[in-house]
C-alpha cells in the first residue's frame, strides 16, 4: 500500500509542476510557435488565390484587343498596294507603271491642220520642262522648247512651231504637218517626285471645208522675275547668242586680253628691286687668321 501512495503523490506533484512550467520540455509537443506560423501561411495562401484570378483576367482582355489591331494593319497594307500600282491599257499592249520617284506615261494625240491642240496634265509641280523630239531620222535628238517654274518662264522658238506653255499645259496652235512628233514633259515636285509624260502628236487634214483663221505666232521671250546669279548667266548667254558675232572677232578679243595681261605682269616684275645673288665676305676673315696662327 505504501508504494501505491508514493506513486500517487509523485503523479500529483508532476502534474502541478507541469501547470506552472511555461517551457516546452519536448520539441515534438510544443505547438505555440507552430500554431502562429500555420495561421500566417493560411492567410498567405488565401491572398494568392485572388491575385492569380486577376492576372488571368488581364491576360484575356489584352488578347481580345490585339486581334482587331492585326486586322486593321492588314487593311492598310492592302490599300497602299492597290494605290501604288497604276495600270495603263492600250489596244495591243498593257503596261503597269508604279508610282516611284520616276514615272513615265505615254499618250497618243491627234490634231488637225490649221487648228490647235492642248497637251495638259494635272497635279502641283515645281519645275516644268518641255522637249520636242526630232523626226524618225533623229530619234535620239531632243530640243527644249519651254521651261517654267514658279517665278521663271522661258521659251525657245523652234522654226515655224507656234506654241505657248505654263505650269499645267502646252498649247500648240496653227498646226502644220511638220508639227507631228513626240513632245515630252519632265516635271518635278518640291519633294523631288519626278515624272515624265510623252505625247505622240499626229497632225492630219480635217474633213471640213471651213476656212481656218491662222493665228500669228506670239512667242514669249525670256520673262524672268528671279535675280539669282545662275539666271543672270543665262541672260548673258542668250544675249551673246542673239548678237550673232563671228568667231574671228571673238578670237581677236581673246588675243588682246591675253596680251594686255602678259604686259602687265612683265612691267610689274621690272619695278621690284632685284636681290643680290650672293653676299660678299669681308677682307679680314677672323677664321682665316686663327688658322694661320
From Swiss-Prot:
The chain crosses the membrane at residues 245-265. This is Membrane protein RL13. It comes from the Viruses. May play a role in modifying tropism or in modulating cell signaling during virus entry. Since RL13 expression severely impairs HCMV replication in epithelial cell cultures, it may act as a regulator promoting persistence by suppressing the switch to fully lytic infection. SUPFAM superfamilies: Immunoglobulin. Keywords: Membrane, Signal, Transmembrane, Transmembrane helix, Viral envelope protein, Virion. The keyword Signal applies. Coiled coil: none annotated.
